[in-house]
């Protein structure tokens, strides 16, 4: 059995203040490339993980995938009351801790395959509870389930009183309060510089603890842009308004914190992609992935990206929104 999952761009967290009894909230876009493709079989004495093209995989990503796959197998077997061994073949992958949500997609994909192989079919939000994902942002879980442009409503502070990243939070996935198709003719160019250090683990937890709560005025400014500019732009297919909203949120609230923690090259990249004609350019999650949104001048923006990355290690990927979730092929 094979599963193909999308990746996601995390545009911003919404409310890391909590004055009105909720925290978190997220805005994101499900994207077609890069993607994960996993194949699973059961009937093995132990767990076996095979990586196609593992020679191209850096050691940190390889180790991270192995840990997450094994944890997802153990958690799902425990849920099912089984001690089954599985073979997982990782056919396609993308780097961990790159701002594209590989951890959530990988954990959900492994659990989904195990559940399906054993005759169970659960919702993504239920699977997320099994594998411990979606405790801060619900964008990755919703991308796996339904795709599209997604806004989630965060968590009640009574059930999640602390400001924590998803990897350290035991909260259940938040409710999805808006989901729309993104226009097919909008192109997304991803520029992924190779980063020597990435934000994850204790480092990520420490950032939340140091910078939160975010001032209420910042949250109010962000939600105004989201409700009265970004969301209507998606519904009306207004690329310029959507891009302008993406540009605006880079300098507000927690997203500004994420941006300020980047290497100077990342912000240089963002400025130059905007100058090249992209309608909007942003940082996905904690980066290092930068995304540019455009329609007619994709080649010019890709050319600029290649020029900027000429003496840098990394990847440039041309992608589009995916308005559906993960696909299983039996």
Task: Describe each region flagged by the PLM.
Residues 6, 85, 145, 283-288:
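Short Gly/Ser/Thr- and Asp/Glu-enriched loop/turn motifs at secondary-structure junctions
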Residues 263-266, 284-291:
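Small/polar glycine-rich anion-binding or flexible loop at a beta-alpha turn
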Residues 2, 12-14, 18-23, 123-276, ...:
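ATP-dependent small-molecule kinase catalytic core of the GHMP/sugar-kinase superfamily
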Residues 1-98, 115-124, 323-324, 329-330:
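ATP-binding N-lobe of GHMP and related small-molecule kinases
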Residues 91-116, 136-144, 281-285:
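Glycine/serine-rich anion-binding loops at beta->alpha junctions
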Residues 40-42, 53, 193, 292-296:
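Short beta-strand-to-loop capping motifs
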Residues 70-71, 75, 105-120, 291-295, ...:
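Extended, folded domain segments that form the structural surfaces/walls around functional sites
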Residues 39, 180, 277-284:
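Short, flexible, solvent-exposed loop/turn segments with mixed acidic/basic and small polar residues
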């Amino acid at each position: 059995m094979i599963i193909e999952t999308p990746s996601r761009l995390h545009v911003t967290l919404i409310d890391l203040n909590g004055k009105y009894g909720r925290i978190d909230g997220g805005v994101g876009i499900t994207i077609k490339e890069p993607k994960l493709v996993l194949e699973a079989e059961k009937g093995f004495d132990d767990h076996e993980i095979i990586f196609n093209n593992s020679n191209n995989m850096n050691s940190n990503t390889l180790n991270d995938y192995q840990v997450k796959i094994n944890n997802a197998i153990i958690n799902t077997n425990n849920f099912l009351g089984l001690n089954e061994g599985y073979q997982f073949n990782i056919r396609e992958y993308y780097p961990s801790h790159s701002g594209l949500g590989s951890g959530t997609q990988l954990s959900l994909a492994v659990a989904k395959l195990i559940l399906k192989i054993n005759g169970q079919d659960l919702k993504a939000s239920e699977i997320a509870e099994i594998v411990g994902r979606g405790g801060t942002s619900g964008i990755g879980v919703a991308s796996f389930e339904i795709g599209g442009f997604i806004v989630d409503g965060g968590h009640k502070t009574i059930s999640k009183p602390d400001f924590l990243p998803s990897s350290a939070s035991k909260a259940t996935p938040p409710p999805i309060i808006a989901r729309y198709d993104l226009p097919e003719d909008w192109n997304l160019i991803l520029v992924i510089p190779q980063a020597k250090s990435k934000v994850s683990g204790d480092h990520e937890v420490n950032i939340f603890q140091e910078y939160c709560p975010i001032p209420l005025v910042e949250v109010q400014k962000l939600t105004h842009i989201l409700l009265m500019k970004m969301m209507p732009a998606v519904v009306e297919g207004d690329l310029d308004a959507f891009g302008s909203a993406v540009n605006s949120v880079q300098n507000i609230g927690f997203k500004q914190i994420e941006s300020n923690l980047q290497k100077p090259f990342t912000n240089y990249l963002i400025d130059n992609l905007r100058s090249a004609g992209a309608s909007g350019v942003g940082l996905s999650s904690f980066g290092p992935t930068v995304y540019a949104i455009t329609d007619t001048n994709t080649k010019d923006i890709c050319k600029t990206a290649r020029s900027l990355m000429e003496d840098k290690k990394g990847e440039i990927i041309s992608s589009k929104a995916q308005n559906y979730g993960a696909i299983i092929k039996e």
